[in-house]
Amino acid sequence: MISSGKPWNGWPVPKRKVCWSENRGDWSEVSLTCQAICGLRSRSGTGSGNSRNGLKESGGSRSGPGKPRGNRKSSRRIRPRPTSEKPRGYWRSSWRRPRSWIERRKRP
């Protein structure tokens, strides 16, 4: 994708621009790891992939100007599952909504 000739400022990555200037050299490595993780995730579905999912969300969004849609889909698919493992604060911070809204969602 670097060979496409687009400037890094052209990517829709507001905060990660700094990260990109740093990790531009390791882009091929990052994309490879992301591809491997994505392949593993899709193959195993959601079988005991909670820990790997946490890794993917942090590292995937960073290495994801090429495919932000897939990442978002997988993260949305997994979010309701590990509620027991992740604290309530994680939900509220991620959704940016009051707790009552989530409670209503959980048990209608």
Swiss-Prot record:
Residues 69-80 have a biased composition (Basic residues). Residues 39-68 have a biased composition (Low complexity). Residues 39-95 are annotated as: Disordered. Keywords: Plasmid. This is Uncharacterized 12.3 kDa protein in mobL 3'region. It comes from the Bacteria. It comes from Acidithiobacillus ferridurans.
